[in-house]
Amino acid sequence: MSSGPVQPAASDATDEAQSEPIIELAGVDFGYTATPGVRDVTLQVDPGEYGAVVGPNGSGKSTLMQLMLGLLKPDEGIARLFGEPSHEFDDGSRIGYVAQSASASKEMPITVREVVKMGRFPHVGFGRLSEEDWEIVDRSLDTVGMTAFADRRVTKLSGGQRQRAFIARALAGEADLLVLDEPTVGVDAESVDAFYDLLETLNHDGITILLIEHDLGAVVDRAERVVCLNREVYFDGPTTEFAESDALSRAFGATASVLSDSQ
């Protein structure tokens, strides 16, 4: 009989993992040589949240996102991702990242199914997918409403369809966190509404959603939480309280009525 410590029950370990913050930033500073970055950022993203980082162009949103995802290392402070130092985190399957350029990826000469297949690579490598892997790919396509387009080349898709294809890739990777950088740039208004409906459904299914946006109107009716950034955090709280705060005028140089008019 082992005399080592008693291991926690599997359910206890699962509960602990589910309660652990996905993203933690504490006193984070980062600066570039020629331009400022972000300063003294402290925030936490918990499992199941639907949040948005908003700010004017050049406010440091992309820098903050890269710090969150471990693509940049803070000059000062602590950045953690799934409990590990962000810049050391290496389980890419847990994160689905949809770049702004995804909607403009017209040059990709591959099919939608091949794009979604890439989501399985962190799990199985670059070899042949098993029958179970292909079932996951097909379920992911179905979830985002792209089954009928599975064999269509990405070059033949609309902007909204391309975004759905890249979300399906993240779902095929069984991601816990979905990060979308300006996801509706170049997408028509009707497709934007359907796109955000999809994100809401995925969030209800347990996926944590984080939007990076400069378009306030795109998130004010959808995200539950807003982090307003202009080099530093001006507001972090429920979306319903954002328009009533002074963060809007301080960060955007605008009044709350502008936000109301954009809805």
Predicted regions and their residues:
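Conserved catalytic motifs of ABC-family nucleotide-binding domains
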Residues: E174
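H-loop/switch region of ABC-family ATPase nucleotide-binding domains
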Residues: E213-H214
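Helix-to-loop junction immediately C-terminal to a conserved catalytic motif
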Residues: L69
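Catalytic Walker B motif of ABC-type/P-loop ATPase nucleotide-binding domains
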Residues: L178-E182
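Conserved ABC ATPase "signature" region
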Residues: K117, E131-F149
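H-loop (His-switch) and adjacent beta-strand-loop-beta switch element
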Residues: R225-T239
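Conserved ABC transporter NBD signature motif
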Residues: G77-I95
